[in-house]
Structure formats: C-alpha cells, structure tokens
C-alpha cells in the first residue's frame, strides 16, 4: 500500500466559523403516523452546493460529518455551524467517517486514496489502498483496524498504521461497508447485489444474493443479529446472519432507496429514498411514519447514538436535523 509522508501533506483547516445558510424548504406534516413518532425540525441548512452523499453523527452525538460530491468533507455542530472542512480529496467523496474513539476522521477519494485527519483538521497521512475509486472506508469498533472497498471490487483490511491484513476480491464494484458492533464480521455490499460477510482475517463466511441490484448501503442491527440493505430496486431488506431474508420493505415503486438505518434502540428502522421521503417501519413491514421532506433525492440518514435526533441530506446539498420523540 502506498503511504504518503505526513510532513508533505499536513495542513490545518479547522476552527473555521461560517454564518449558517438556512435552506428555504418548508417541512410538511407527516402523511402517515401510526406510532406517535414526532420529528420536530431543530435545524435546516445548506451543507454544500452539490449533493451530499453521506452524513454521520459523531460517536458522542455532538457533531455531524458530511461527505459531498465535490470532494469536501465537513464537520458541523448539530446547530449547523461549520467547524471545518477536509479538502484536497479527488471528487466525488463517497463517504467520510469518524473513528469510534473520536480521534480520527477518514475520507475517501476517487483516485484510490483515503486520508486520515485529526480533529484539528491536520492531515495525518494519505494512503492508497486501491487503484480505483474508494467507495467506503470504516473503522473497527476499537478503532485499530480500517476496512476499505473500491470500484476495483476489492475489500481490504489493514491496520491503522497501514499494514495490510487481507484483500478480498469480488465481482462488481464494492459499494458500502458495515462493521459488526462486537467486531466479529465485516459486511461488504456491491453493485451486483451481493452481500458478503467477511471475518476480520479476510475469510468470506457467507455470500448472500440480495436481488436488489446495486446496494447503496448496509448496516448491522444494534445487537449485531441482523443486517439491513437498501437497493436501487426501491426496496430495503432485513436479513439474519445466516443469510435468510426476514422481511422486504417495498419503499418506492420506482427509484432508489439510498439509505436504510436501524433505530439505535432496535424497535424499528428508517429509509430515505429518491422521492424525497423519510419513512419509518416496524420490522414486520408495517409503515408507521411517512414524511415527504423535499422534491429531490434524499441521499442519507443518520440517527444520533441515543436515538433522540435524526439527520438527513439531499442531492441538493441540504441538511436537516430533527428532534425525535415517541
């Protein structure tokens, strides 16, 4: 793996203060509410001039991290105040994440690179694990292992210091990753609709054909016993670790489901789709909440770790932060 020296690339970008730009989109009332769920808009702002591909709450729930199509990662307060930007990655940036120990930020590049940053915005190092675009990068629960996946079909596992542990080659573009909450497995999904469960040593433990076409994201349930996938066929699917389908959620008749997330307390799940709508579902498939949000694609969702807030993003660069109660 090519690792670039830190001293050649270190620069500080944080402690930037900017006026909040409020998006001029009015949030309508939910058209379905069978559960008593309440989403009250806390903050709405413009996070980018282009599509925001992913948003994540920090592990402590105090910050938001966005990855945008222009190759810029941005750290925000929950109130929409920009703390700083991570620039220089070749666009588009498909994902950016914070390590569970809240010490490191990781961003992905279209040129096969990932960059590791500290919270002061200083670039610690740049690594090139792939020769094609890096679609996702994720930390293990103890923050010591990094996993990447790429357009080259490879999922790579290596130490925080850059030493490769394993490389798993599969057909099709590897699209998104999830780490088991106890670190037991890595889930890797692809444009071909396959879901692979890989152990930390790189052995494929199970391959699941989802029938969803390109899979946009994958998540483990909070207890680690189930998996959730979202696809371009308009569905989200719930699986057990044996690869058995528990339920299919037919979210939209046309268009993509771009994000499907477990509620942190495990009672239900949420989807965001091309029709600009947030939906909550019981695990048995009952639609319990539906909120039309915007006349644009919703690209990503993220629950705060305590489940009290939900963040959403759009293809127009908008960010919403809701307070959630039920």
From Swiss-Prot:
Highest taxon of the lineage: Bacteria
Keywords, alphabetical: Repeat, WD repeat
Pfam families: ANAPC4_WD40 (PF12894), WD40 (PF00400)
GO cellular component: outer membrane-bounded periplasmic space
WD repeat residues: 47-77, 88-118, 129-159, 169-199, 210-240, 252-282
TM region positions: none
Keyword Nucleus: no
SMART domains in the record: WD40 (SM00320)
Alphabetical list of InterPro entries matching this protein: Apc4-like_WD40_dom, WD40/YVTN_repeat-like_dom_sf, WD40_repeat_CS, WD40_repeat_dom_sf, WD40_rpt
Glycosyltransferase is among the record's keywords: no
PANTHER family listed in its UniProt record: TRANSCRIPTION INITIATION FACTOR TFIID (PTHR19879), TRANSCRIPTION INITIATION FACTOR TFIID SUBUNIT 5 (PTHR19879:SF9)
Protein name: WD repeat-containing protein slr1409
